[in-house]
A protein has these predicted regions:
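Short "lid" loop at the C-terminus of a central beta-strand within the Rossmann-like core
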Residues: 60, 103-107, 131
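Conserved SAM/SAH cofactor-binding pocket of Class I
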Residues: 1-79, 85-86
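Short glycine-/small-residue-rich Rossmann-like dinucleotide-binding loops
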Residues: 77-78, 103, 147
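Short alpha-helix immediately C-terminal to the canonical SAM-binding loop
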Residues: 36-38, 106, 110
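Helix-to-beta-strand junctions that scaffold the AdoMet/dcAdoMet cofactor pocket
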Residues: 22, 92-94
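Conserved beta-strand signature within the Rossmann-like core of class I S-adenosyl-L-methionine
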Residues: 95-105
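Residue-level signal for inorganic ion chemistry
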Residues: 18, 102, 143
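SAM/dcSAM-binding transferase cores
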Residues: 111-165
Length: 165
C-alpha cells in the first residue's frame, strides 16, 4: 500500500479526502499545532478511518528518524517552496513523489526553488495550474525524488527560515 505523509495538514487536506478515496492507503499526518492533531484524530474516529497516524511534530524533527520512508509527501499552504522543499523532500523515498499545492504564485516559487529542490534530490515532473470555481488559480507542483537527500538536510527550522536553500 502507498504510504503518504501530509506535512502541516491543517484541517486534513489533502490527506483525509485521499484516504477516503483510497482506503488501502496508509497516512501519516505531521502537524505542529496540537489542537489540529486533536481535531484530526476526532475526525478519523468519527468517520472510522483506520491506518491514519496524526502526530504533533514538526516535519524537520520527524525526518531525523524517518528519512526517505514515504512513497508520497503532500503539503498545502505551509511555507514558501524553498523552505517547504527542505521540510518535505528528506521524507520522500528515492523514486517517490512530493506534491506541493501552491497558490497562484506557484510557478514563480518553483523557479526560485529550483536550486533547493535539486540539492535535495528532486526533479520537477509536472507543474499544473488549476482553476477553482471562484476563478482563483492554484498550482500543483509534482516532484520525483531521483537522488538521496544529503544527510545534512533538513536543518533546524530557524536555519531553514533564516537562509533558505
Amino acid at each position: 500500500a502507498v504510504h503518504l505523509c501530509d506535512v502541516g495538514a491543517g484541517a486534513g487536506f489533502p490527506s483525509l479526502p485521499l484516504k477516503i478515496m483510497n482506503p488501502q492507503m496508509k497516512i501519516t499526518i505531521l502537524e505542529p499545532l496540537n489542537k489540529r492533531v486533536v481535531f484530526l484524530k476526532e475526525v478519523c474516529r468519527e468517520i472510522q478511518l483506520d491506518n491514519v497516524e496524526c502526530l504533533n511534530v514538526r516535519a524537520e524533527d520527524y525526518a531525523k528518524e524517518h528519512r526517505e520512508s514515504f512513497d508520497l509527501v503532500t503539503a498545502r499552504a505551509v511555507a514558501n517552496l524553498r523552505v517547504l522543499s527542505e521540510l518535505c523532500l528528506p521524507l520522500v523515498k528515492k523514486n517517490g513523489i512530493f506534491v506541493a499545492m501552491k497558490g497562484a504564485a506557484g510557478f514563480e516559487e518553483q523557479a526560485e526553488a529550483e536550486k533547493a529542490t535539486k540539492i535535495l534530490g528532486a526533479e520537477l515532473e509536472k507543474a499544473e495550474e488549476v482553476h477553482l470555481q471562484d476563478g482563483s488559480a492554484r498550482v500543483n507542483l509534482t516532484y520525483r525524488k531521483v537522488r538521496t537527500t544529503p544527510p545534512q538536510y533538513p536543518r533546524a527550522y530557524a536555519k531553514i527560515k533564516k537562509s533558505p536553500l
